[in-house]
């Protein structure tokens, strides 16, 4: 009877080989939701109304399930449909690897509690969401999942045992927070995390502690993600790379390890960290010999080479004290390793300082290191966690564009506007349109503009000053930014801080009573033009006309 009821509610297409859309209303139980999924076939979609559904849920291959639907299934809101395990077992799992991409989206997935080992789809995965190949969660809030047995719970929020990290996105546009696991408090993945926020997770369970408070990459990828405020019960507060992994265009900030490595730990095999901002992480290990491992620790031992490029590593700490050296780098295959196009924290006048093993074959190059010596990154508001760039930053345009593997930054701004910036954020540029003007020279900063119309790229937040020098016989009538008139102070106009595309309009007027001299003098005597008379100027003749005679 339940199945008949569900299909009566939700079958939007004729009972045929065509895909069906099945609607589940909020008065139904978690058991009935699972029955609707079990009764669907590959290609069908299940739409779930906003509400709370208790239980343990299993994906079915080829059946996409989405939550957040309103009363008449015409609009959708993220996180309004809640899947709650009520602290008893895993919330959502994929029973085996799929060959058809299967997506669950727009859910809150919460209150899982793994109490014993589960081998589905792989042994010891998450209490929140456990995924294999071709399984994906999207636009989901995954929170408050934990474990209560002395065994593995790899990835408290999301555990993934995908095969191909390059093509398998296991979680996209998700918030993964307040979860507890053993290898990655937030997530443990072999696939790809894309556009996710992983925050306030831990591997500090009293039952069993583990490494990687935020993310454990088991040969996986993390692209355009934020990893912040996580706590490790062992080593690596932010992200641990085990196996050949990649961290691309991501922010790793404010994480803490009770052991060593506050930010990123690369172990077991070489990995790539490209275009990332790794800041303000802390390690609490007692052994001072690990001080330099506060930002990035590279213990790579493979001849594939670890690549650290286009990053900013700044302000990472040991027991709350910012360390002079921010990156620890050791390799048995030194010639294959590179650290370049990076700015790291320095407390001395010796420039950028790295802790490296004493091997003359190691290669470290830093573009313009002398110019960068002693210069801070100029973040927007680091005290409040805003590590976006300001226009004063020495990181602007310093990255190697050939290594910039994404076209958008962490905010979705285009990369490579005026060169690629170091770190995860690109400073936006706006257009200052200078409306057509004549009879004056405009100077903005060190750039001069004569008569004409111009489009000038301006960095966000930049406050430009301008001077205007009218030609002889002319003066400034008005200066406006869009519709707002500007007033000069001691001859200098201050343009408002750039936050949008704007138009600068300069109106120049001819002075009354001012002579306009031409290059050739008229040999004829000056004539007085009386009221009512017409003066005709013919080709080939030039005159000196005094304004007082007009």
What does each of the following model-derived ranges do?
Residues 16-35, 42, 52, 377-385:
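Right-handed parallel beta-helix/beta-solenoid
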């Amino acid at each position: 009877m339940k199945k008949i009821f569900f299909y009566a509610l939700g079958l939007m297409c004729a009972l045929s080989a065509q895909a069906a859309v099945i609607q589940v209303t909020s008065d139904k139980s978690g058991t009935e939701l699972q029955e609707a999924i079990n009764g669907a076939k590959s290609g069908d979609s299940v739409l779930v109304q906003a509400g709370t559904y208790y239980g343990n849920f299993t994906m079915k291959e080829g059946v996409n399930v989405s939550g957040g639907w309103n009363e008449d299934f015409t609009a959708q809101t993220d996180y309004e449909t809640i899947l709650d395990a009520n602290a008893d077992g895993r919330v959502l799992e994929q029973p085996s690897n799929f060959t058809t991409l299967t997506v669950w989206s727009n859910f809150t997935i919460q209150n899982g509690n793994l109490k014993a080992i589960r081998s589905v789809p792989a042994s010891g995965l998450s209490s929140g969401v456990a995924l294999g190949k071709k399984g994906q969660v999207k636009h989901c809030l995954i929170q408050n999942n934990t474990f209560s047995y002395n065994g593995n719970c790899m990835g408290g929020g999301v555990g993934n045992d995908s095969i191909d990290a390059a093509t398998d996105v296991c979680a996209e546009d998700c918030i993964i927070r307040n979860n507890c696991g053993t290898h990655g408090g937030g997530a443990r993945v072999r696939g790809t995390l894309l556009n996710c926020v992983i925050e306030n997770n831990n591997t500090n369970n009293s039952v069993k502690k583990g490494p990687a408070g935020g993310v454990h990459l088991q040969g996986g990828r993390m692209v355009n993600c934020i990893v912040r405020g996580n706590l490790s019960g062992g080593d690596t507060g932010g992200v641990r790379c085990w196996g050949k992994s990649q961290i691309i265009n991501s922010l790793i900030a404010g994480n803490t390890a009770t052991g060593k490595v506050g930010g990123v730990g690369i172990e077991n095999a070489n990995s790539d960290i490209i275009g990332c901002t790794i800041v303000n992480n802390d390690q609490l290990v007692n052994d001072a010999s690990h001080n330099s491992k506060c930002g990035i620790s590279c213990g790579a031992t493979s001849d594939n080479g670890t690549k650290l490029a286009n990053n900013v590593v700044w302000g990472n700490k040991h027991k709350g004290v910012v360390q002079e050296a921010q990156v620890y780098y050791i390799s048995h295959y030194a010639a294959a390793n590179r650290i370049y196009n990076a700015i790291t924290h320095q407390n001395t006048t010796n420039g950028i300082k790295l802790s490296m093993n004493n091997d003359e074959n190691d290669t470290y190059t830093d573009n313009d290191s002398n110019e960068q010596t002693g210069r801070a990154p100029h973040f927007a508001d680091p005290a409040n966690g805003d590590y976006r760039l300001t226009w004063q930053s020495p990181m602007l345009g310093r990255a190697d564009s050939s290594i910039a593997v994404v076209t958008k930054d962490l905010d979705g701004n285009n990369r490579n506007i005026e060169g690629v910036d170091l770190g995860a954020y690109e400073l936006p540029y706006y257009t200052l349109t200078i409306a057509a003007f004549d009879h004056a020279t405009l100077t903005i900063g060190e750039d001069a503009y004569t008569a004409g119309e111009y489009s000038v790229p301006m960095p966000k937040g930049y406050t430009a000053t301008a001077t205007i020098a009218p030609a002889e016989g002319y003066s400034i009538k008005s200066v406006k930014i869009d519709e707002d008139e500007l007033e000069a102070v001691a001859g200098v106009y201050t343009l408002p801080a750039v936050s949008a595309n704007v138009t600068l309009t300069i109106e120049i007027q001819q002075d009354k009573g001012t002579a306009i001299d031409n290059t050739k003098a008229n040999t004829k005597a000056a004539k007085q033009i009386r009221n009512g008379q017409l003066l005709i100027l013919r080709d080939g003749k030039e005159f000196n006309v005094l304004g007082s005679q007009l």
